[in-house]
UniProtKB/Swiss-Prot annotation:
Source lineage: Eukaryota, Metazoa, Chordata, Craniata, Vertebrata
Residue ranges of every copy of the PH domain listed in the record: 158-257
Designated name of the protein: Pleckstrin homology domain-containing family A member 7
Protein role: Required for zonula adherens biogenesis and maintenance.
Biased segments, Basic and acidic residues type: 568-577, 913-924
GO cellular component, one term: centrosome
Single GO BP term: epithelial cell-cell adhesion
Gene: plekha7
Chain intervals for the UniProt region annotation (Disordered): 98-148, 348-384, 423-467, 508-577, 830-928, 1032-1064
Alphabetized GO MF terms: delta-catenin binding
Chain intervals with Basic residues compositional bias: 1032-1043
C-alpha cells in the first residue's frame, strides 16, 4: 500500500505533510506543487491504496464505491480499468458495467462519484440504478482485519519486533490465546505460529494509544497491556515477562506515532526529525483520488504572467507549514479540524502576477507571513493547521508564535480579500464537497481532484474500509438518501452549508458517531463577516492540503462540542441558547484521552436538566438558494426565538423534582421483584448457553486432537505440537467448566428465589380473590379486579420463560444419562458397612455378594480362642443367621401376610419340611422362591483352597464362597479341619443397634433401596412346591431303606445331627460382645463328606406314623386380624372353617396310621402325598370363601 517515507532522502527543496487520515504528501518548494509520490523513490506513501508488484512505478490499485477495481497512474494523473502491463480488465470486474469517465467540462456530470469519507474519485462506476451491486462491499467493511481481509504484509519492510503474545478474543468467552506477533510497517500482524505462513489478522497501529491495563479494564492477567483508539475496538495483549511487555509497549507506541527508531529528541523535547511513514501496507481504503495536485486545464484565454509555458495548467501548490511531532500528535488525535485544508482554484484570465505570492503568504512580500520557515503550525480558533515535517524553531519561542497566529491569519485573510476583489473564483475556509462556482471554465480530467455536489459524492461502499470510517460512511449514505436533490444551485455563497458539512465531517474524525463534535457558535459574527463575500470552490479531502484549509473562524472560547445523540439524523443541528453555551477553553494536550475527558467533563449532557435547552432542527435543504446574508439573518432569528422560549431556564433549574411513587401496593412490589428475578434468570441462562457452546466447541477440537495424537503417535514432533495445543485447550476447558458450574449454581439459587416469589404471588392472588368474593363495595371490587389483572398479566408473560428455566435447572440437578453405577447399600446392617471395591466394579455379582464384608487381619490369627458350640435341642434346626442374638432379647418379627403359611405350619412334619426347605434354599440362594444373598466371608487362602479355585474372579483382599446349586454335594469342601479367624469390628459403627435377622428384613420391608435394586421376587406356585416335596420324600425313603439294612451302627451314626454342607453356615460367632473395638473370633467346625444328601432331623417311622401331637403355633404365624372388626356372621363362618380343618387333619392322620403298609413303602408314600394335598386344597378354598363372605358383609354394611 505504501513505500517507506525515507525522509532523509528528500531533496533540499522538498518537504512533506500529513493529512488527517494519515496520508503523506510531498511539497516541491521550487515548483510550488504538491504530489503523492516520493521525490526519490517515485512511490506513494501511506496513500490508502494497494501497491501491487505487477504494476509499474507510480501506479496503485483502487476500488470504486461499488467494489470495482481500477488502477491509478500518479505519473500521468489518470485512472483506468485496464491493467497497464497486461492491457486487460481485471476479472473481478466481470459483474460490473464499466464506463470510462468522459473528458468533457465540469458542467457535464460523469457517471462516477466521489467517496465522501475516503475522498475517492474514480473514472468509472456501476450504473447508479443498480442497487444490488451497490451493496456488494458492505459485508467486507465489517470483516476488515481478519484473515482474508487482513492487510497484506510487505516482506521487504524490516521487522521491528516479533515474538509470542497472548491476545484476548473479541467475542464469546474472551479467552486468551497465544499467537505469534510481528510488528512491521506500523502494523501489528499475528500468526498461528512462528513460521508466519498465513496471517490471522492485522491491527493498524497509527493513532492508537498503547498503555498497560487499568482497573477499569477488569483484566487480572499479569503483564497485560492494551491498544486503544476512540470509536474503535480495544485490543488486549499479555506478555510472558515484564521485560517483554515493556519492549512491546515501547515499539507499538512508536508505531502508533508513526515514528521510526531513529527519531531523536533534543533536550527541550522538540524533535530534530519527524519521520512520518506509511501506516499500513494494505489499508484497503478505496481512496481513489489520491492526486498530486489539482490541474486547471488551459482555457481559451489565459495569462501566464511569469509562469513558464509548462506551468500554464497551474498546479495548485501548498503553503509550507512546519510543526513539531508534539503538535502533530495533538492535531492527529485531538484537533478535529487540524488538517482541514482547501484548494485554491485560479480563474482563467485573472491570475495576477502576485498570485503565487498570495497562495504562499510565507513567501509574499506584501503580506505578513503566517509562519516562518522554522516556525510552528498556524492555529486559528485554537485549531492547529495542516502539518508536515520540519525542523524545530530556534528563533522565537512557541508561545510567542502561538499568540501571534490568529492575528497573522486575520491580516492574511484581509489581504487576500483585497487582492482578489472582483475575481471569479476565490477560496473558502471550510472545504467540503461543494461544486465550483463556474464549472464551464474547467474540464474534468480523469485524475480528478475537485469534488462534485453532495448528490454526486456519496460515500463509497468500498472494498475494505477500515472501521474508523465506516460510521461516517453509513451516516453520509443516510444523509444523501434524505436529500433528493441532484445538485445545489451554484449562484450563492453556500458558506453556512459548508459550516454544517464541516461539522458533520468533524464529528466522525475517528469514526465514532458519539465522538465530540466541534460546532461553531450560533452567532457567526466573525465567521460570516470574514467569509461572507468569499465564494468557495471546495475540493475532495484526497487533494494534498494547502494553507487556506482552516476551520471556521470564531473565538477559541466560543467553540464547543454539541451534545448530540449518537444517532441523530445527519441533517439536524442542535442549537443551544446563548446563556447555556459554556465557554470551553481547550488547552493543548499530548494525550488524546486527556482532551476527550476534559471536553466530556465540561459539557456532560447528563449534567444538564431535561429542559435546560431546546433542540431546534435546521433543515439543510432549506438553506439552498440563499445568500450568506440571508442565511445569517435566518440563523439570528432562530436564535432570538430560542432565547424567548428558554427565558425561564434558571427557574426550571432551581425547581425541585416531583416525587414519584413507584409502587402503589404490595402486589406491585412483589410483581416487580418477580420480574427482576426473571430477568436475572434470563441473563444467567444466556451466559450458560454461551458457556455450553464454548465448551462443546473446545471438546470437539480436543476430540480431533486426540485422534491426531493416535494418528501421529509415531512422529514425536507432531505429537509434541498437538500435546501443547491440547494443554492450552484443556486449560480453557477447565475454566469454562468451572464457570458453567458457578453459573449453574447461581441459576439454581435464582430459580429457588423465583419459585418462592411465584408462590407468594399465588398466595396474594388467592387472598385477593377471597377479598373480592367477600367485598360488597363496587369500587373496592374494581380495585381488586385490577390487581388481579395485573397479576394475571405478569404471570402470563412469565409463563413463556418459566418452562425454559425449569428445564435448564433440572438438566443440572437430574441429568438424563447416568453412566456411573450407584453403590448398592448392604442388605443387612452390620458393624462393618464399608462396601468392597469388587462390589462397585462388578455390580452383576452383587446378588452373590455378602452383606458382611469383614476385613481379615492375618496378625489376629494368633489370638484364636475356642468358641463354645450351640447345644443340640429337639426343635428343628434354626436357619443360620449372620450374627448370634442374645436369648434375652429375641427379635420381634411381624406376622407373615399369607394364610397359606398358616396352613403349612399346622403339622410337625410340615414344619420340619419347611425348615429343611428353608435351609436348603439359603444354601442354594433361594428361599421359598425368593432370591437371597449369600454370605461373603473373608478367609485366608490356606483355609479355603477349594473355594479359591472355584471362584471365577476373586479380589486379592478376600475370597468368596461358592454358591451351591440344586445339587449341593458337588460344592462341598473335601477337607476336615478347624479354621478360625479374627474379625475386627468397625470402630465408628460400634454404637449401632444389633442387626435384624433375615426374616425380620423380609417382613418389615425396611431396606427399601435393596428391594428396589434386586429383581422382583416371585413366589413358587403350588405345583412347584408339590414337585419339590415329592423329590424330597423319595430321597427320604431311599435313606430309610439304607439305614434299615445297615443296622444300628450306621443308624446311630446317621442319627447325629449332620453338619451343613455350606461352610458359611458352619461359622458361629460368640454371643458376648463386650466392646466395640474387641476382636470377634470365628471358628469353623469339622465338615465330613457324605455320600447322600444330609438328614436334618432324626427319623423314627413309628413317630412319623403315629397321631401327631399338638403343636404350638407362634403368634407371628397367625393372621393378624382382630375380632373386633368382624361381624357376627364372619366370626361364625371362621369358627366353622377352623373346626372343619381340624377335623380333616385329625382324620387324615388316623387314616394314614391305619392304612400304611410297611411292605410297600412307595405305595404308602404316594397315598400320603394325596392325603397331604387335600388339606392344602381345603385351606385354599376356605380362605377364598372367607374373603368372599367378608367382602359381601362389607358391601351390605
Amino acid at each position: 500500500m505504501a513505500a517507506p517515507l525515507r525522509r532523509d532522502t528528500l531533496p533540499d527543496n522538498g518537504s512533506y505533510g500529513v493529512c488527517r487520515d494519515g496520508r503523506v504528501f510531498f511539497i516541491d518548494d521550487e515548483a510550488r506543487a504538491t504530489t503523492w509520490l516520493h521525490p526519490r523513490t517515485g512511490q506513494p506513501v501511506n496513500s490508502g491504496h494497494m501497491i501491487r508488484s505487477d504494476l509499474p512505478s507510480g501506479w496503485e490499485e483502487g476500488f470504486t464505491k461499488e467494489g470495482a477495481s481500477f488502477f491509478i497512474d500518479h505519473n500521468q494523473r489518470t485512472t483506468t480499468f485496464i491493467h497497464p502491463v497486461t492491457g486487460q480488465i481485471s476479472t473481478e470486474n466481470s459483474d460490473f458495467r464499466l464506463q470510462d469517465q468522459p473528458g468533457g467540462r465540469m458542467l457535464k456530470q460523469p457517471s462516477s462519484t466521489i467517496s465522501e469519507a475516503s475522498t475517492t474519485v474514480t473514472t468509472s462506476t456501476v450504473d447508479s440504478t443498480s442497487g444490488s451491486k451497490g451493496s456488494r462491499s458492505s459485508g467486507r467493511v465489517h470483516s476488515f482485519g481478519k484473515r482474508d481481509h487482513a492487510i497484506k504484509r510487505n516482506p521487504s519492510v524490516p521487522v521491528v519486533v516479533r515474538g509470542w503474545l497472548y491476545k484476548q478474543d473479541s467475542s464469546g468467552m474472551r479467552l486468551w490465546k497465544r499467537k505469534w506477533f510481528v510488528l512491521a510497517d506500523f502494523c501489528l500482524f499475528y500468526y498461528k505460529d512462528s513460521r508466519e505462513e498465513s496471517v490471522l489478522g492485522s491491527i493498524p497501529l497509527p493513532s492508537y494509544t498503547i498503555a498497560p491495563v487499568g482497573p477499569e479494564d477488569h483484566i487480572s492477567r499479569k503483564y497485560a497491556f492494551k491498544a486503544e483508539h476512540t470509536g474503535m475496538r480495544t485490543y488486549y495483549f499479555s506478555a510472558d515477562t515484564q521485560e517483554d511487555m515493556n519492549g512491546w509497549v515501547r515499539a507499538m507506541n512508536q508505531a502508533a506515532l508513526m515514528q521510526t527508531h531513529t527519531v531523536k529528541r533534543d533536550e527541550c523535547g522538540h524533535p530534530d526529525h519527524v519521520n512520518v511513514s506509511e501506516k499500513l501496507k494494505k489499508q484497503a481504503v478505496p481512496q481513489t483520488n489520491h492526486i498530486n495536485s489539482y490541474v486547471i486545464p488551459k482555457p481559451e484565454v489565459i495569462q501566464s504572467d511569469g509562469l513558464p509555458e509548462d506551468k500554464r495548467e497551474g498546479f495548485v501548490g501548498e503553503v509550507e507549514i512546519q510543526v513539531t511531532p508534539r503538535e502533530m500528535e495533538q492535531a492527529r488525535g485531538k484537533s478535529p479540524a487540524s488538517r482541514v485544508v482547501e484548494v485554491e482554484v485560479l480563474a482563467p484570465g485573472s491570475t495576477p502576477p502576485s498570485r503565487v505570492a498570495s497562495r504562499a503568504p510565507s513567501r509574499a512580500v506584501s503580506t505578513p507571513p503566517v509562519v516562518q520557515r522554522n516556525g510552528t503550525p498556524i492555529e486559528q480558533n485554537g485549531m492547529p493547521g495542516c502539518q508536515r515535517g520540519a525542523t524545530p524553531s530556534a528563533q522565537t519561542p512557541v508561545q510567542v508564535q502561538r499568540r501571534s497566529t490568529l492575528e497573522q491569519v486575520e491580516n492574511w485573510v484581509k489581504v487576500q480579500k483585497e487582492e482578489r476583489h472582483g475575481l471569479v473564483s476565490t477560496e473558502s475556509t471550510v472545504p467540503r464537497r461543494t461544486p465550483p462556482i463556474h464549472p464551464k471554465y474547467g474540464t474534468m480530467d480523469k485524475y480528478q481532484s475537485l469534488p462534485k455536489t453532495s448528490r454526486q459524492s456519496p460515500p463509497a461502499p468500498h472494498h475494505q474500509l477500515p472501521s474508523e470510517y465506516k460510521y461516517s460512511h453509513d451516516r453520509l449514505n443516510h444523509f444523501q438518501k434524505i436529500h433528493g436533490h441532484t445538485k445545489r444551485p451554484t449562484t450563492h455563497d453556500n458558506t453556512v452549508w459548508q459550516l454544517f458539512e464541516w461539522q458533520q465531517r468533524q464529528q466522525f474524525r475517528h469514526g465514532s458517531p458519539s465522538a465530540p463534535v466541534y460546532t461553531p457558535a450560533p452567532d457567526y459574527s466573525t465567521a460570516v463577516s470574514s467569509t461572507r463575500n468569499n465564494s468557495d470552490v471546495s475540493r475532495s479531502v484526497s487533494v494534498p492540503p494547502t494553507l487556506a484549509d482552516i476551520p471556521p473562524p470564531g473565538p477559541p472560547g466560543a467553540r464547543l462540542m454539541s451534545p448530540r445523540r449518537p444517532h441523530t439524523p445527519a441533517e439536524r443541528v442542535t442549537v443551544r441558547p446563548l446563556e447555556d453555551r459554556p465557554i470551553v477553553e481547550v488547552p493543548p494536550s499530548n494525550s488524546p484521552h486527556r482532551l476527550r475527558s476534559y471536553k466530556s467533563a465540561t459539557i456532560e449532557r447528563r449534567s444538564m436538566p431535561p429542559s435546560a435547552y431546546i433542540t431546534h432542527t435546521v433543515s439543510a435543504p432549506s438553506l439552498h438558494g440563499k445568500t450568506a446574508d440571508d442565511t445569517y439573518m435566518h440563523l439570528k432569528k432562530d436564535l432570538e426565538y430560542l432565547d424567548l422560549k428558554v427565558s425561564g431556564t434558571e427557574a426550571l433549574k432551581g425547581r425541585p423534582a416531583k416525587p414519584v411513587k413507584v409502587a402503589e401496593s404490595d402486589v406491585d412490589v412483589t410483581l416487580s421483584r418477580l420480574c427482576e428475578q426473571d430477568k436475572i434468570l434470563q441473563e444467567l441462562e444466556f451466559r450458560l448457553s454461551g458457556l455450553k457452546d464454548d465448551k462443546d466447541k473446545l471438546e470437539s477440537v480436543l476430540d480431533v486432537s486426540h485422534q491426531q495424537m493416535e494418528q501421529y503417535k509415531d512422529q514425536p514432533s507432531h505429537t509434541d505440537k498437538i500435546a501443547y495445543q491440547q494443554r492450552l485447550l484443556q486449560e480453557d476447558l477447565v475454566h469454562i467448566r468451572a464457570d458453567i458450574s458457578r453459573v449453574s449454581t447461581e441459576m439454581e439459587r435464582a430459580w429457588d428465589d423465583y419459585s418462592r416469589m411465584e408462590q407468594s404471588v399465588e398466595q396474594l392472588r388467592d387472598v385477593l380473590q377471597t377479598q373480592m368474593t367477600l367485598c360488597t363495595s363496587p369500587q373496592e371490587k374494581n380495585q381488586l379486579k385490577r390487581e388481579l389483572w395485573r397479576i394475571e398479566d405478569v404471570m402470563t408473560g412469565l409463563s413463556s420463560t418459566k418452562e425454559t428455566f425449569k428445564i435448564t435447572v433440572d438438566s443440572v440437578k437430574n441429568p438424563e444419562r447416568k453412566l456411573v453405577p450407584s453403590v448398592i447399600e448392604s442388605t443387612v446392617p452390620s458393624r462393618c458397612m464399608t462396601p468392597s471395591a469388587a462390589e462397585v466394579r462388578s455390580p452383576q455379582r452383587s446378588l452373590t455378594s455378602s452383606p458382611l464384608p469383614l476385613p481379615l487381619d492375618n496378625e489376629d490369627l494368633r489370638n484364636r480362642h475356642p468358641v463354645p458350640n450351640w447345644e443340640e435341642d429337639d426343635a428343628p434346626p434354626r436357619p443360620p443367621l449372620p450374627l448370634l442374638y442374645d436369648e434375652d432379647t429375641p427379635p420381634v418379627v411381624p406376622p407373615l401376610p399369607k394364610e397359606t403359611s398358616v396352613i403349612r405350619h399346622t403339622s410337625v412334619r410340615g414344619l420340619k419340611r419347611q425348615s429343611d426347605e428353608r435351609k436348603r434354599d439359603r444354601e442354594s440362594s433361594y428361599s421359598n422362591g425368593d432370591y437371597r444373598l449369600e454370605l461373603r466371608s473373608y478367609l485366608s487362602e490356606p483355609e479355603l483352597p477349594v473355594s479359591a479355585h472355584g471362584a471365577d474372579h476373586v479380589d486379592p483382599g478376600y475370597l468368596t464362597l461358592q454358591r451351591r446349586g440344586l445339587s449341593g454335594s458337588s460344592s462341598r469342601i473335601n477337607q476336615y479341619g478347624v479354621a478360625s479367624c479374627s474379625l475386627r469390628r468397625d470402630l465408628e459403627l460400634s454404637t449401632m443397634e444389633r442387626p435384624k435377622s433375615a426374616l425380620e428384613r423380609l417382613c418389615s420391608g425396611e431396606p427399601q433401596l435393596e428391594q428396589q435394586s434386586q429383581p422382583q421376587r416371585v413366589r413358587m406356585s403350588v405345583e412347584e412346591q408339590l414337585e419339590r416335596m415329592k423329590r424330597h420324600q423319595r430321597a427320604l425313603v431311599r435313606e430309610r431303606k439304607r439305614n434299615l439294612s445297615q443296622g444300628e451302627r450306621h443308624h446311630s451314626r446317621a442319627s447325629t445331627r449332620p453338619v451343613n454342607s455350606d461352610p458359611g453356615s458352619a461359622l458361629f460367632v460368640e454371643p458376648y460382645r463386650p466392646a466395640s473395638d474387641e476382636w470377634l473370633t470365628v471358628r469353623a467346625r469339622p465338615v465330613m463328606e457324605l455320600e447322600l444328601e444330609p438328614l436334618d432331623f432324626e427319623f423314627d417311622i413309628t413317630r412319623e406314623l403315629s397321631t401327631p401331637q399338638k403343636v404350638w403355633i407362634p403368634q407371628r404365624l397367625i393372621d393378624d386380624e382382630s375380632d373386633e372388626d368382624l361381624s357376627p356372621e364372619e366370626k361364625e363362618t371362621r369358627s366353622r372353617t377352623v373346626a372343619k380343618i381340624k377335623t380333616l387333619l385329625s382324620k387324615s392322620s388316623m387314616r394314614s396310621s391305619e392304612q400304611m403298609d410297611f411292605s410297600d413303602l412307595d405305595l404308602a408314600l404316594q397315598q400320603q402325598e394325596r392325603i397331604m394335598s387335600v388339606p392344602r386344597a381345603l385351606a385354599t378354598e376356605a380362605s377364598i370363601k372367607r374373603r368372599q363372605v367378608t367382602a359381601k358383609a362389607m358391601s351390605e354394611g
